[in-house]
């Protein structure tokens, strides 16, 4: 099974070797058919503490690293 890859914005970098990434998804409301935005935060592993708040990054699913971390940052798209 391929690993999932998501794109999001770093919203937290205070933890050691961890960043919090907000991933936004859009979908049509089932009744109103209006486009709705929902977001979810994921904790991702950042080995070198190189990503800062505001960076757009790609995260990839991985084996559990800690209680909450199951994602790792693979690349940055820019600010």
Curated annotation (Swiss-Prot):
Q: Which biological processes are named by the entry's GO terms?
A: translation
Q: Which GO terms describe its molecular function?
A: rRNA binding; structural constituent of ribosome
The transmembrane residues are none
**Where are the disulfide bridges?**
none
Q: Name one Pfam family in it.
A: Ribosomal_S17
| Gene3D superfamilies referenced in this protein's UniProt entry, alphabetically | Nucleic acid-binding proteins
Family the entry assigns: Belongs to the universal ribosomal protein uS17 family.
Q: How does it assemble?
A: Part of the 30S ribosomal subunit.
Q: Which PANTHER family match?
A: 40S RIBOSOMAL PROTEIN S11 FAMILY MEMBER, SMALL RIBOSOMAL SUBUNIT PROTEIN US17M
On whether Ribonucleoprotein is a keyword of this UniProt record, the answer is: yes
Listed A to Z, the keywords are:
Ribonucleoprotein, Ribosomal protein, RNA-binding, rRNA-binding
Question: What is the protein name stated in its UniProt record?
Answer: Small ribosomal subunit protein uS17
What organism is the protein native to? Answer: Rhizobium johnstonii (strain DSM 114642 / LMG 32736 / 3841) (Rhizobium leguminosarum bv. viciae)
GO CC terms of this entry: cytosolic small ribosomal subunit
